[in-house]
């Protein structure tokens, strides 16, 4: 699992965490690394307009690799 290059939208994080039944991030907290690595914010995009909908239907846990890579916003 790679380090996110941007901060996730608060709504997406809440949906993912609630689906997983926890309050902790999906992986260990790399918040400082994320901020240090986010120089332009250009990488913080969803590659599909359905990302938020997918998160609300459980795709964060069903397909975490795709969601982390393609649904970053």
From Swiss-Prot:
Main localization category: secreted
Classification lineage: Eukaryota, Metazoa, Spiralia, Lophotrochozoa, Mollusca
UniProt-listed InterPro entries: ShKT_dom
Keywords (A to Z) from UniProt: Cleavage on pair of basic residues, Disulfide bond, Neurotoxin, Secreted, Signal, Toxin
Role summary: Probable neurotoxin.
Disulfide bonds: none
Full protein name: Conotoxin Im14.3
GO MF assignments: toxin activity
Propeptide: 18-35
Domain ShKT: 44-73
Basic and acidic residues composition-biased segments: 27-38
Disordered, as annotated region: 22-42
Database matches in Pfam families: ShK
Tissues expressing the protein: Expressed by the venom duct.
Domain notes: The cysteine framework is XIV (C-C-C-C).
GO cellular component, one term: extracellular region
Mod. after translation: Contain 2 disulfide bonds.
Superkingdom as given in the UniProt entry: Eukaryota
Signal peptide: 1-17
PROSITE patterns xrefs: SHKT
Compartments reported by the entry: Secreted
């Amino acid at each position: 699992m790679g380090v996110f290059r941007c901060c996730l939208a608060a709504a997406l994080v809440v949906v993912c965490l609630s689906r997983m039944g926890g309050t902790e991030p999906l992986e260990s907290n790399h918040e400082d690394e994320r901020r240090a690595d986010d120089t332009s914010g250009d990488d913080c995009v969803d590659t599909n307009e359905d990302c938020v909908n997918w998160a609300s239907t459980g795709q964060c846990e069903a397909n975490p690799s795709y969601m982390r890579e393609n649904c970053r916003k």
